[in-house]
Amino acid sequence: MESREFGGLGQVSALTLGGGGIGQVWGATSRDESVATLRAAVDAGINLIDLAPSYGDGEAERVFGQAFSGSVPTGLRFTTKCRLGSPAPDQVFPQLEQSLNESFERLKVDRVDLFFLHSQIIPDDSVDRYEGTPRGLFVASVMPAFERLVSDGRIGAWAITGIGVPQAVLETIKAEPQPAAVQAIANLLDSPGASKRYDEAAIPRDIIAAASQRGVGVMGIRAVQAGALTSSLDRELPEDHPEAVDYRLAAPFRSRAAEL
């Protein structure tokens, strides 16, 4: 398995196992199958597992907890996240801490390597238009809360999900202290699909470039654009759903792939 330096976590496998599948986000599967998938990925050399409470309402984290029962294999790195929104400043740390403690219980651990803000970061003047965490709140309250969790030894580092309003994401990457990593859209369509909840154009390549220039680790997400870049979608979607639209746009890609 090829490895790469990632976000201060040292060498990790180039491939990451995302928790959406084992959390049944993309369709129903059994707990036993999910546990077997996780163990098979680790046996194959994948040593970075990306999880979140929202992946199956905690199911992905429970799969991890069942698979390893608190005895995490040496060298295995894993993440979790918190969808924070826009609470009052004095509620930021309590909400992050509560989410983290609930994740610990499901994961059967007392520390995670990387803790992501799962909310979209938005400009302060966009709170009436977009759902997410205002950048001012992020700077004043979220970053200090993350740094406190690092100092307490409960997280190795903190990171952001870079699918918010692009300018706010870029400002966060370029600020100090900088995140250890950013999750960025990385697919052949440059499409965030249904995860895009703002009016501005998506610029994932600019976000990746800015992170690379700053030494911020990049975790590519939506590599097959939620199924739009695969041979078939595994679920029924309305014709105007972003993933269905992208699936039709990707028809030439599928034709070319079939020739190879």
PLM region descriptions:
Residues 5, 12-16, 47-48, 75-81, ...:
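Structural preference for beta-strand elements that scaffold enzyme active sites
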Residues 120-260:
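Beta/alpha (TIM)-barrel catalytic core signal, keyed to glycine-rich beta->alpha loops juxtaposed to Asp/Glu
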Residues 20-32, 82-95, 131-132:
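Active-site mouth loops of central-metabolism enzymes
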Residues 28-41, 91-106, 164-173:
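Short, acidic/polar
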Residues 95-116, 148-152, 183:
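CE4/NodB-like, metal-dependent polysaccharide N-deacetylase domain
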Residues 1-76, 187:
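N-terminal binding-site loop/beta-alpha segment at the start of enzyme catalytic domains
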Residues 71-94, 116-121:
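Structural motif corresponding to the early beta-alpha repeats
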Residues 7-12, 43, 65-77, 104-110, ...:
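Acidic (Asp/Glu)-rich catalytic clusters
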